[in-house]
Amino acid sequence: MITPQQALTRLVEQREIFHDEMLALMRQIMRGELTPVQIAGVITGLRVKKETVGEIAAAAEVMREFALEVPVQQREHLVDTCGTGGDAAHTFNISTTAAFVAAAAGARVAKHGGRSVSSTSGSADVLEALGVNLALTPEQVAASIDAIGIGFMFAPNFHGAMRHAAPVRRELGVRTLFNILGPLTNPANAPHQLLGVFHADLVGILVRVLQRLGSSHVMVVHGSDGMDEITLAGDTLIGELKDGEVSEYTINPREFGLQPCGSDALKVWDATQAKDMLLSVLDDLPGPARDIVLFNAGAAIYVADRAATLGEGIELAREAIRSGAARDKLQQLVAYSTQAKQA
């Protein structure tokens, strides 16, 4: 057992917290055994030192341990499209839109998310605007995924132990370990993942964290314009975990027949605008919004092992939108979640 004081001493000296020690420290935080000052000291110390793969993996293990489990029965092709947020791009909900497209193409989507971090509309905000009921039990979310191929887990409902750290995070107002733990702690434990990150340095780190956590097929992505998505603006840095091996490379929209475009055409200022842009994509309106969803949904389909290549995934995404299947998937989730609320 490591005390908060011992951990702080280690961090001030720029030394790593070992795996078992990090497990113990994180459990103390999750149980409410540390004071707000101690929590602030530890997470700030980790940030200043720079969190290692081992420290992040241990913290994620504990957060998963304390989360409510979503007991999905059919785990093959189960994928999450959750990102860190924090890129301040103010774009519409690309990964949420991509989730419906991927589900329509045969992936099973366990979408994990919350309210806005730095954008004007988080995944929960836009889904609520679309009529999705966020207050489902773990069993109801699992049933949704098994029945219609997609379910949404509103993060605060599944990570109750985070209440001990949440006020500290808000008051500190700077990025800490907890900003990157959310996408690593899917309550359905999805083995496939498309994870967008707010800084290029996190690509190599988080793909190796997911490797340690036992993920199957993962892409961690960061756009050259700073987006925590696969971008149309230029290159995207990719960290891919496949067949137990990690590779890092870049991709560009031109390689896949997509028109390069900056993020201005993707900006929204509230959940209503985000909803309208999401619906325009699902209605197959040509333009940058549809193209960036094709790019990201294609990647989600690929990492869910529903396509052999990213290019094939993009074509499957294109057909899912063109056929109306992606729009149908949204309507199915609205209907299923509303029915569950009334049950």
From Swiss-Prot:
InterPro entries: Anthranilate_Pribosyl_Tfrase, Glycosyl_Trfase_fam3, Glycosyl_Trfase_fam3_N_dom, Glycosyl_Trfase_fam3_N_dom_sf, Nuc_phospho_transferase. Homodimer. Catalyzes the transfer of the phosphoribosyl group of 5-phosphorylribose-1-pyrophosphate (PRPP) to anthranilate to yield N-(5'-phosphoribosyl)-anthranilate (PRA). This is Anthranilate phosphoribosyltransferase. It comes from Thiobacillus denitrificans (strain ATCC 25259 / T1). One of its GO terms (biological process) is L-tryptophan biosynthetic process. It is an enzyme of class 2 (transferase). Keywords: Amino-acid biosynthesis, Aromatic amino acid biosynthesis, Glycosyltransferase, Magnesium, Metal-binding, Transferase, Tryptophan biosynthesis. The gene is trpD. GO terms for molecular function: anthranilate phosphoribosyltransferase activity; magnesium ion binding. One of its GO terms (cellular component) is cytosol. Mg(2+) 2 binds at D228, E229. Binds 2 magnesium ions per monomer. Mg(2+) 1 binds at S95, E229. Anthranilate 2 binds at R169. Belongs to the anthranilate phosphoribosyltransferase family. Its EC number is 2.4.2.18. It catalyses: N-(5-phospho-beta-D-ribosyl)anthranilate + diphosphate = 5-phospho-alpha-D-ribose 1-diphosphate + anthranilate. Its cofactor is Mg(2+).
